[in-house]
Amino acid sequence: MKAKLLILFCAFTATDADTICIGYHANNSTDTVDTVLEKNVTVTHSVNLLEDSHNGKLCRLKGIAPLQLGNCSIAGWILGNPECESLFSQKSWSYIAETPNSENGTCYPGYFADYEELREQLSSVSSFERFEIFPKESSWPNHTVTKGVTASCSHKGRSSFYRNLLWLTEKNGLYPNLSKSYVNNKEKEVLVLWGVHHPSNIGDQRAIYHTENAYVSVVSSHYNRRFIPEIAKRPKVRGQEGRINYYWTLLEPRDTIIFEANGNLIAPWYAFALSRGFGSGIITSNASMDECDAKCQTPQGAINSSLPFQNVHPVTIGECPKYVRSTKLRMATGLRNIPSIQSR
């Protein structure tokens, strides 16, 4: 009896209707998606997959603040430009933020060898130990360590020099041959930096080093170079016709680095024992630091999103959505929004 009543009910319901809807319910959705064969296909439902917004700020990543270089470049920071001295108080960071046009870089003009490679190495560093590799007061008893200053590296109106390098000069009219070595006992890679001075004239060469035929030799298991100063007049840069070329190497644990010279050495003073961290990096950005926390940082600003894709910037640090160049990316969760109606 129940079965008969159900059949009668269905029959009466069909009789009262003017039309029968075949398939699925249409709606007033204007969502469009691109398919393999068609573009801008209207569908009943879709979800957005693309994050296109950011907060315009530099934020902490997982609670760890970045190292914001301010007016200093990577070169100015790592060499110890006097105007960048305050940066050494920060020993660890989530990432490094550098502005596009940093004013404080190499204060004494010259060439920085393999600079982009150094940036690449530092991009994976999340902390370091800065230490005296050759203590200033005890390492160079036969040379002067206090007169190597210059107006181009001035600090608070006075001539100065890099905080991580020492400009060795003659002492009592002599510049004895020097030989100094360091054994890496840090159990980490150690970044060592030094320079070679190229005076603008022979008079300066004699006055500073008391030799005309100088050389600088630097040797380790993975590095071996001999430098000969090039004495020549050059166009003035920051008031200097001379140049200092800057060099660096990574010293493996238990390896030894040896410096030998009879003039023109800009000696290491401080070096860095490096700790590498997954997810660190260097970004170039004009964004300002804010009291915010994020999982993903871009040069434009931080992204806080659970979406799988973003078009904010291709350079990212942290746990970030995958970058795509698309301006729209939606996934259809419904069907094509074209109903079919059949009249009785």
From Swiss-Prot:
Family the UniProt entry places it in: Belongs to the influenza viruses hemagglutinin family.
GO cellular component: a single term: virion membrane
Role, per record: Binds to sialic acid-containing receptors on the cell surface, bringing about the attachment of the virus particle to the cell. This attachment induces virion internalization of about two third of the virus particles through clathrin-dependent endocytosis and about one third through a clathrin- and caveolin-independent pathway. Plays a major role in the determination of host range restriction and virulence. Class I viral fusion protein.
More about this protein: Major glycoprotein, comprises over 80% of the envelope proteins present in virus particle.
Assembly notes: Homotrimer of disulfide-linked HA1-HA2.
Species in which this protein is naturally found: Influenza A virus (strain A/Harbin/1/1988 H1N2)
InterPro entries hit by this protein: Capsid_hemagglutn, Hemagglutn_HA1_a/b_dom_sf, Hemagglutn_influenz_A, Hemagglutn_influenz_A/B
Name of this chain's protein: Hemagglutinin
